[in-house]
């Protein structure tokens, strides 16, 4: 599933091609992705793209008449192609530009979304979201306040979008490894020093992943079709049974909150109650 670095990589990739361009047409080849595709998207035809923003794992293409909101879901991807390139299987939406280019959305599993938002109106999917992890708003003081007296395990806590957005399964596992915190540690039991390190590692891991173009495991590729290279940097995620890069112990795996989780039992020691 594309996570924050993959979505940010997509934003950076499409921005030079869309910024300042006029939308000539929006071609929709399916009625429904995760949700029905609204007819209101057609209001954007003839409008000039003012900006491309990201909030959590949503992309927003802004025009004077409103915004297209895009979520890549489990298997969605965006490509910028010449308009004459024929559509292929699973190419569900085209944003056709007057410069002869098309932003094409492909989604084999159809768990993504294309939505519409009026100018000045916050769409309901963007409500109740926590701060962006790479902003100053997400800091150790904020984390400690949210974690106070909580028994939730730390991995589920940092993956909660109401706490902080965009820390998906891959990057949660990697950040906890770098911070030497076991993923099943009750978040309310973390020391201030551990929180400080974890917040710093979350930021560092996400920043590195964005620089590497995200992580390509199965479905994600960059806008130009190239893979994301952060997969080569993974220390624990997807490496069950392999040696820890720090201590050579075997990487362990277990489902936590229905998500596969990976850690080193030696580097990430779980204290007994």
From Swiss-Prot:
Cofactors (names): Zn(2+)
Active site (record annotation): 2-3, 57, 259
Binding site for DNA: 90, 109, 150
Database matches in Pfam families: Fapy_DNA_glyco (PF01149), H2TH (PF06831), zf-FPG_IleRS (PF06827)
Keywords: DNA damage, DNA repair, DNA-binding, Glycosidase, Hydrolase, Lyase, Metal-binding, Multifunctional enzyme, Zinc, Zinc-finger
Function, in words: Involved in base excision repair of DNA damaged by oxidation or by mutagenic agents. Acts as a DNA glycosylase that recognizes and removes damaged bases. Has a preference for oxidized purines, such as 7,8-dihydro-8-oxoguanine (8-oxoG). Has AP (apurinic/apyrimidinic) lyase activity and introduces nicks in the DNA strand. Cleaves the DNA backbone by beta-delta elimination to generate a single-strand break at the site of the removed base with both 3'- and 5'-phosphates.
Similarity section: Belongs to the FPG family.
PANTHER family: FORMAMIDOPYRIMIDINE-DNA GLYCOSYLASE (PTHR22993:SF9)
Subunit structure: Monomer.
Protein name as catalogued: Formamidopyrimidine-DNA glycosylase
Organism annotation: Aliivibrio fischeri (strain MJ11)
């Amino acid at each position: 599933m594309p996570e924050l670095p993959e979505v940010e990589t997509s934003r950076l990739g499409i921005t030079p091609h869309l910024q300042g361009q006029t939308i000539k047409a929006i071609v929709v080849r399916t009625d429904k992705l995760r949700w029905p595709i609204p007819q209101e998207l057609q209001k954007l035809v003839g409008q000039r793209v003012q900006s491309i923003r990201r909030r959590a794992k949503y992309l927003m293409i802004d025009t004077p008449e409103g915004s297209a909101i895009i979520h890549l879901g489990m298997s969605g991807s965006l490509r910028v192609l010449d308009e004459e390139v024929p559509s292929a299987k699973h190419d569900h939406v085209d944003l056709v530009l007057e410069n002869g280019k098309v932003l094409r959305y492909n989604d084999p599993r159809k768990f993504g979304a294309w939505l519409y938002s009026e100018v000045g109106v916050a769409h309901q999917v963007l409500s109740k979201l926590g701060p962006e992890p790479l902003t100053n708003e997400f800091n150790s003081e904020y984390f400690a306040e949210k974690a106070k007296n909580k028994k939730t395990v730390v991995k589920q806590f940092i993956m909660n979008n109401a706490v902080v957005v965009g820390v998906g399964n891959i990057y949660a596992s990697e950040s906890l490894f770098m911070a030497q915190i076991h993923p099943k540690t009750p978040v309310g039991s973390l020391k201030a020093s551990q929180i400080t390190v974890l917040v710093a590692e979350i930021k560092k891991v996400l920043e590195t992943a964005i620089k590497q173009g995200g992580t390509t495991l199965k479905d994600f590729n960059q806008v130009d079709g190239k893979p994301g290279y952060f997969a080569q940097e993974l220390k624990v995620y997807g490496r069950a049974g392999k040696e820890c890069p720090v201590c050579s112990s075997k990487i362990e795996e277990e489902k936590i909150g229905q998500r596969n989780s990976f850690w080193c039992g030696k580097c990430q020691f779980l204290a007994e109650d």
